[in-house]
Amino acid sequence: MVSRVAKNPIKIPTGVEVNVAGQQITVKGKLGTLTRVIHRAVKVTKTDAELQTICANDSPGSNALAGTARAVLANMVQGVHTGFQRKLVMVGVGYRAKAEGKKLNLTVGLSHPVNIEMPEGITVETPSQTEIIVKGADKQRVSQVAANIREIRPPEPYKGKGIRYDNERVILKEAKKK
């Protein structure tokens, strides 16, 4: 039995170079280089323009591991080719963001401004004072940085003030009745 996700091959676009060395897979593209070690229960084969994940043995969880490995590899290929981005929106009076190089300065109603240093391979933009766009080649890192920024002031349930993802719906609670 083969995982439905792992059955689908990953197409390698032009301009992306994939190197398979045992369990270590390196993907190079215009946006950088990503390296990941895949679990030993999964075998990765490379043809001219495709990557295929196969179960290396018949252990109970190898189907799930093959599907996960395929999804991770597809994200690596897409990341170095087109990249990933997460958009955050700030809602609240006086909430502002400003990107300065590899730093993000936030004013979110605390007694002090919050300065965040971006990790290697991650860039941040602020098209307006209330919008933050986090970009990078590694989907996991981009999402983690966006989650760390949101965690500083998550949306509160009564007025909806805080930092939220662009597509996030905040369900507002009703205020206490007298």
Curated annotation (Swiss-Prot):
This protein binds to the 23S rRNA, and is important in its secondary structure. It is located near the subunit interface in the base of the L7/L12 stalk, and near the tRNA binding site of the peptidyltransferase center. GO terms for cellular component: cytosolic large ribosomal subunit. Part of the 50S ribosomal subunit. Keywords: Ribonucleoprotein, Ribosomal protein, RNA-binding, rRNA-binding. It comes from Coxiella burnetii (strain RSA 493 / Nine Mile phase I). InterPro entries: Ribosomal_uL6-like (IPR000702), Ribosomal_uL6-like_a/b-dom_sf (IPR036789), Ribosomal_uL6_a/b-dom (IPR020040), Ribosomal_uL6_bac-type (IPR019906), Ribosomal_uL6_CS (IPR002358). GO terms for biological process: cytoplasmic translation. This is Large ribosomal subunit protein uL6. Belongs to the universal ribosomal protein uL6 family. It comes from the Bacteria. Gene3D superfamilies: Ribosomal protein L6, alpha-beta domain. HAMAP family: Ribosomal_uL6_B. Coiled coil: none annotated. GO terms for molecular function: rRNA binding; structural constituent of ribosome.
